[in-house]
Amino acid sequence: FDSPSAATQWMEMVQPKCIVFIKYEFWYYYLKLAAVNKIPTFLASAVFRPDQIFFKFYGGFYRSMLQLFTGILVQDIHSKNLIAPLLKDTHLQITGDTRFDRVLDIAATKKSIDWVSKLAEGKIIVTGSTWEDDHQIIGSVSAQCDQLEQCNWIIVPHHVDAASIKACRSHFTNAICLSEWLTQSNTMEKPVVLIIDQIGLLSQLYQYAAIAYIGGGFTKDGIHNVLEAAVFGKPVIWGPNDLKYPEAIGLRNAYGGIQIMDASSLNKTLEKLLNETTFSKATGDAALKFVQAHAGATQKTMEFIYENR
């Protein structure tokens, strides 16, 4: 928690020489105590938007917090242009988003998942970090689209508690949970819809996808990580709420990602990707190229911190 006592206790225990905060982390008491003790602090992979409190007439306290950073490293020129007028002595530089390097590392060290090969023949559609609104739409489309009869669905819900898995399962006919299937796979029919009821598999599952769908686009907070799928050269689909995510907008503009608005547009998009192999490959290739083009943020970030610490 961000409190004077918590900050003091943490400083005494860790005794940091430098502190790096990530993206949206603004911990006032930690920043203040670091400034008093002349400990360099950096905000990395930061993103700023006009609707944030820093740019409101009542955001003076939050604007003053920005002055406590030794340096702020932003993802893009839009963030830099927004924040530059608010800074005095704080160093400011565009370094990009370190998540691009992270997903490239995941792809380079990918691990095989044995049970995927046991699925029925056909293309696999992986849906990652999905919510109830996603399940309603995906469930409707999977039951209607003729082209999807030859596909396997791997559904990876954002929440894997019993109630959430039960709710997810209710949207799909004859869906099977992974834990259930693995214990009875010798006697149970191979699933068309497999619901992953455990954590830690999603980033590795995308390598097996013909198409990836990213959840969260129908929630207030927006979509989850599109880069984990894009790095494997997969066409990536998501819902309408992506305006807070520069990487998603960039992926769309690079023709590696497709935004859908409802069940009808998802149906049409899936049919196009499944029927038109040239289009599907071009979309996947564009997704990978987009990720590769944005590599290097980690090195830039480390160099900036080293030079300004």
Stretches with model-predicted labels:
Residues 96, 177-180, 188-198:
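Active-site donor-binding acidic/aromatic loop of nucleotide-activated sugar
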Residues 10-12, 65, 118, 205, ...:
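Structural alpha-helical scaffold elements that stabilize or flank donor/cofactor-binding regions
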Residues 104, 108-182:
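Conserved catalytic-core segment of nucleotide-activated headgroup transferases in glycan assembly
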Residues 41-45, 90-96, 150-155, 175-178, ...:
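Short hydrophobic/aromatic-enriched beta-strand-loop microsegments
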